[in-house]
């Protein structure tokens, strides 16, 4: 095991403030170097400049983290002796630390990810709320007593799974830490979390608070590294009991194969989407224009549930496009540290180039460019909010996940057509319905094959409400009480109270 401690570097953000940034792997409540001393260069997508270098974990570092997590999960270890209420207090203290350091964490998130500072603050507060919520659940998730007959007593227990591997994406780095860590720890598991290679900084900042919040060594471990070595090692490790992954459907398949071919570990997957946002003739068009803009341009379009397909009923099609374009023109793109910026940078040059190539493909295949379509500014990976009309579902922009600020607009005639076309996707993460007819709202919501349906709104998530996908958008649910089921296994106990001998 690497015993070389790696402390931190100082980072100055564009506002002039200087913050402490941990750069080592967080294993056993210490920041340590990777075994082989590898480094990951971290760049700011808004400036294209190097921020710092962090430790690069490989298979050997994963092995070390698994060993300490397994040791922390042993029945005689301090963590296993914590009461459920004690676990809850640790999580609540972590929520307090996050709130007390909100500006620090949001600034690091904005520098590393490129999202606007206002969105980053919202993410950090939502993460604190999530930790506090699951802190409250820690002593409330229990089994049942089951009456069968007078000579037998039975009950169930919800027991932790064990050592859990967790792999998070780059679009919501800090918030995804909370979504993964909080329910797992509330249930009594130990975890090894892998950050996204592009955005490791805020998760490493979170680890500063773990020891002071009372978590014993080995309970929470955080590794920065790439998917090929670190992520694959977690997915295929024989001593990890469960893996939770958020990211693309393609990588989700790889995680699932690795989990199945190793020790058949339990899997939770929150994957991609090409979500339909359906606008009916009777909708409040101004309101719907706001929500469809928010549904695709929020977080620079880098949202798994982004409403990237907008279906508009034919009678209001032309007028609604005008209103969407008018709203898109009001959205400020640029410096993510400016308080009035709505849309920041795309996360990387590769992602920027991918988005631009989709726009070019759509136009080449007959889509009409209503607004945007090109780079914003000369520095940083900014893409203008882009709306394409006259899109058909055989175009790449109409059926593939772009993960950027690109909206495909498609015309429809009837409710039945809207449902059929909305469901015409391999994905099923989310959908939106805009109408003033409550009967149609419920009818369409019930018929759409999606894990979340928003009516007259979009992109509203909350830690109390489950989130996850149908079809190729994932397996399992995160958040709410449903999120606890990902991290527990049910044991049934039968007690003989005087039954006759069976033989």
Swiss-Prot record:
Site-annotated residues for Transition state stabilizer: 171
Post-translational modification Phosphoserine, affected residues: 248, 501
Family: Belongs to the aldehyde dehydrogenase family.
Record flagged with keyword Oxidoreductase: yes
Protein name: Putative aldehyde dehydrogenase-like protein C9E9.09c
Pfam families: Aldedh
EC number of this enzyme: 1.2.1.-
PANTHER family per UniProt: ALDEHYDE DEHYDROGENASE-RELATED
Active-site residues from the entry: 270, 304
Family annotation (SUPFAM superfamilies): ALDH-like (SSF53720)
A cellular component annotation (GO) from this entry: cytoplasm
A Gene Ontology biological process term: ethanol catabolic process
Record organism: Schizosaccharomyces pombe (strain 972 / ATCC 24843)
Alphabetical keyword list: NAD, Oxidoreductase, Phosphoprotein
Binding site for NAD(+): 247-252
EC category name: oxidoreductase
GO MF annotations, alphabetized: aldehyde dehydrogenase (NAD+) activity
Keyword Phosphoprotein: yes
